[in-house]
Amino acid sequence: MEEGSNKREGLPPQLLDLIPDEKEWKLREALGLGRSRNAGFDGEEDKKLDLKLGLPGFIEDDEAETLRDYRLQQESPSLSLSFFPKHSKTTSSTTTTTGAKRGFIDTVEDKTEGYNDQKQQARAGCGKELAVEEMIAAVSERKKGCCPPPPPPHGAPATPARNRPQTQGRGAAAPVVGWPPIRSFRRNLASSSSSKHSPEPQNDNANAKVTLTCKKNPLVKINMDGIPIGRKIDLAAYNSYDGLSSAVKQLFHGFLQAQKDQTNAQIAQQGADDKIFYQLLDGSGEYTLVYEDSEGDRMLVGDVPWKVFVSTAKRLRVLRSSELSHTLIGATARV
């Protein structure tokens, strides 16, 4: 009977059924999920070579799912009916596939987020370094006092909002942008040149006052006829022409005495010498005091106010009155 049944069904010898440890074959026979016994080995090879869409490891065959369910049933301590229901199988397969896909997407998103975080950190670090460098340059320039501190650049990499300056002047110069960063002294030069404004026009009277009060060289050369050595006098140290006349007397009185013999008659004439120096300003004595102005013209001392004389006098001379022209003396007398 057994041989007849085997011939009728066309089955190969059931050698593996005699092995008690081969539970997978028994499971296939029990559930009927294996291949039909009439199918040959060629059909199995064709099924293995079938092309399937999807990532490796995420799509599983029905046989693999059945084997997995069977192993879980054998390992679990709870009682079972030797197979799992269909809905549990489908839910488990869907959860595994979706979980795997979610895990893959999460890893990709984590990598992209980590890359973006690294880029932002690098930009923030570069911005902090530039901000520190600009602060150091500004402090050094303030200590030197050569130029005002530069305004904070707007084109630098973004810095945190709490470190960003809140107030800026209306007339702030345009920032100097570039990469690699421009050195601090070049940035200061560019900002100072762009922040310079045109000077405001001033009145002629104001310019005249400045030239009168701000004379750089108050020392003036003075020479006297008959004395080969000249002297220098500070006009700013005196407030009137009388003080200037007494100063000229002190400068050249000793030279005049050295040129003459020291006799009793000469000593008696000392009062006459004082009178000569006293009449320097009006031109009625033996000597007359004149000066050269900024244009090189020879003028008589005492014609203009004292401040104008101090600002325009370039050189003084004590000349003999006999050498002066009569016209100049006559004009002085009329004045």
From Swiss-Prot:
Tissue spec: Highly expressed in roots. Expressed in shoots and flowers.
Region spans: Disordered: 81-102, 143-180, 188-207
Keyword Cytoplasm: no
Compartments in which it is found: Nucleus
Record flagged with keyword S-adenosyl-L-methionine: no
Domain PB1 per the UniProt entry, residue ranges: 217-321
GO BP, sorted A to Z: auxin-activated signaling pathway; regulation of DNA-templated transcription; regulation of translation; response to auxin
Pfam families recorded: AUX_IAA
Gene Ontology cellular component annotations, sorted alphabetically: nucleus
Induction: Not induced by auxin.
InterPro entries documented for this protein: AUX/IAA_dom (IPR033389), AUX_IAA (IPR003311), PB1-like (IPR053793)
Motif (EAR-like (transcriptional repression)) on chain: 51-55
Keywords: Auxin signaling pathway, Nucleus, Repressor, Transcription, Transcription regulation
PROSITE patterns according to UniProt: PB1
Primary residence: nucleus
Function (record text): Aux/IAA proteins are short-lived transcriptional factors that function as repressors of early auxin response genes at low auxin concentrations.
Subunit structure: Homodimers and heterodimers.
Family: Belongs to the Aux/IAA family.
Name of the molecule in the record: Auxin-responsive protein IAA6
Native source organism of the sequence: Oryza sativa subsp. japonica
Gene of this entry: IAA6
